[in-house]
Amino acid sequence: MGMRMMFTVFLLVVLTTTVVSFPSDSASDVRDDEAKDERSDMYKSKRNGRCCHPACGKHFSCGR
C-alpha cells in the first residue's frame, strides 16, 4: 500500500472511532445520573449515626 492509502485508512479508523464513541458516552452519562440519584450505603448509615467505612468511621460508631 502507498502512503496515501495508509493515511486514508488511518483517517477512516480515527473518524469511525470518534463517531462510535459519542453515543456510548451519552449512554454512560445517563447511567451516571441514575447512580447519583440513588443514595449510597455510606450516606444512609450516616443518617442513622453509624458508619463502618474507614472514611466516616472516625466520626460515627460502627454499630456492630
From Swiss-Prot:
NAD found in the keyword field: no
Modified residues (Cysteine amide): 62
Molecular function as annotated in GO: acetylcholine receptor inhibitor activity; ion channel regulator activity; toxin activity
Disulfide-linked positions: 51-56, 52-62
Record-linked PROSITE patterns: ALPHA_CONOTOXIN (PS60014)
InterPro entries xrefs: Conotoxin_a-typ, Conotoxin_a-typ_CS
Signal peptide location: 1-21
Main function: Alpha-conotoxins act on postsynaptic membranes, they bind to the nicotinic acetylcholine receptors (nAChR) and thus inhibit them.
Domain statement: The cysteine framework is I (CC-C-C). Alpha3/5 pattern.
Additional comment: Found in injectable (milked) (IV) venom.
Family: Belongs to the conotoxin A superfamily.
Full protein name: Alpha-conotoxin CnIC
Source organism of the structure: Conus consors
Organism ancestry: Eukaryota, Metazoa, Spiralia, Lophotrochozoa, Mollusca
